[in-house]
Amino acid sequence: GWGGRFNPIHTMLATGTDAVAGRHDKAGLRYADDMVTMPLQCGTQWDGLGHIFYGETMWNGYDARLVDSTGAKKHGIHKARAGMIGRGVLLDIPRYRGGDYLEEGYGIGNADLDGCAKAQGVKIKPGDFVIVRTGQMEHCLARGDWGTYAAGDAPGLRFETAEWIHRNKIAAICCDTWGCEVRPNESTEAFQPWHWIVIPMIGIWMGEIFYLQDLAAVCARDTVYEFLFC
């Protein structure tokens, strides 16, 4: 996959076959053991402030070299492990537009975000955790094929929404797609250009590959689109 990412690999280190074959007899204990090898971005995850660099710096002007082979000396996502809590708001864009999911390549603009919030009767406030549903994940699950979900064409946020994020002073933006922003990207001169602005310039945490089907169903049933995010 992109960036050397791959699906989780499950490896058996010891099995019942080993036990029956006598491979464990010397230790006197017969057992099964295993391990999983996986990139941390192969599933639901947060893009921390040390994930994207603009030139040679990250958010707040820190040198990109502060993220090295030993980890992040600045802006590691672990710093937020006890503080990622606040008012969550779901913006269900396909439901607002009258469908089950958005087509690949559909760019969600500021008008979509504002229109959806108004239709749902919810107001975006500073510090909110805004969760944008496209329905792409559910569409893949329903057809039984992930296709090019990882780094392929996808509905997502347009470049202009960086201004919306900054203006509304939200704490984080989340989505049910691989990379939140629309793909193909709006510019052919930069890969994931929205990331370049939102993380290292605005300083926003970004949640990706969020499973939203159940949350969306409950919000629609109750006609309540705000909740405790933690």
Residue positions per predicted region:
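Active-/binding-site microenvironments in catalytic and ligand-binding cores
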Residues: 1-230
